[in-house]
Amino acid sequence: MAYSYLIVGSGLTGATIARQLLDAGKSCLVLEKRPHVGGNVYTRLVDGIHVHQYGAHIFHTNHEALWRYVHRFVHMNRYTNSPIANYQGQLYNLPFNMNTFYQLWGVRTPEEAQRELERQRAQAALAHPPRNLEEQALQLVGRDIYEKLIKGYTEKQWGRPCRELPPEIIRRLPVRLTFDNNYFNAEYQGVPKEGYTALIEKLLDGAEVRCNTDYLADRAAYDALAERVVYTGCIDAFFDDCFGPLAYRRVRFETERLEMPNYQGNAVVNYTDAQTPYTRIIEHKHFTFGTQPYTIISREYSAEWKPGEEPYYPINDEKNQRLYQRYQALADKRPNVTFCGRLAQYRYADMDVAMEEALRTADELLRS
């Protein structure tokens, strides 16, 4: 056969696996349906600004080895994710911390904040376990935070009332009794100075990459080219949606250049009221501390997904999980195909988790 491995998808998972296989002397053909590599971490250089084409991506990890691995290919900056929430024109720091509590209630000490949190939690006390997301959130943080910073944003994100969403979506909500706006607790955090596309291109260096190529459109011909297949696309599509499609949410972006040096003063601002149609605005230059006299922003809208559109977030409710398990049972009967990545495994994964799992998968492939 012409190649040792056929890798379907050039996102973070596929590219990381390719790098490990290539370093072990294996030949790889990578097929990408989109006109560019990188999947959803793809960044496009526009007028000197790296635009996160599919939404904000901030790499974070507690594992030094993974941080060093990424540094083999790109230079990571020291960007720290400190998003802001805009509720009806009022600004609040995220995650929920002493700055947030001061902005909400005027409290200045952890003791005052804890007392108010406990008071509001007690008001929301239930005689039964939380049955939906609203009850869960009220139990965790009380009504003020729920109404201003969770409810509207979450309902826009998922397209349904919080009372109809499962409580498992927010198993926990971090509450910090310190003045700390760092969203992630990870020891290492940053964004590639050269953009994420540069990272993907370095990971894929040495592989044959074919963009604008739909593996599923001519599967038999592509399978004949390699000894083994690594598939990172939608698992239901692989099996021709034989049990019906899995459900996702999609995201739509409106991106524009503005002739001003600074639009919102922060990379990410969430709009948490129900009246604002978009969920957040991203100002891309702030990810890499840009100083250009202009800026580029993206408004992010969450919407229902239909087959043929780009899937973003899996809807991991009970119905879809049962459906996924049926597809997984079919995948288990394909020993020559490795299914990995967020779409093939129907779950959300942070970038560090995706890369670590890709590294483990590559190691297993090389040992098999």
Task: Annotate each language-model stretch with its function.
Residues 47-123:
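Dinucleotide-binding Rossmann-like beta1-alpha1 core, especially the glycine-rich loop
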Residues 3-30, 362:
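N-terminal Rossmann-like FAD-binding beta1-loop-alpha1 element of flavoenzymes
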Residues 216-330:
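Mid-domain catalytic core of redox enzymes
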Residues 22-47:
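Glycine-rich FAD pyrophosphate-binding loop
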Residues 69-72, 145, 264, 276:
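Structural/interface elements that position substrates and couple domains in central-metabolism enzymes
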Residues 310-368:
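C-terminal catalytic lobe of FAD-dependent flavoproteins
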Residues 9, 80, 209-215, 341:
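Short loop/edge segments at beta-strand edges and connector loops
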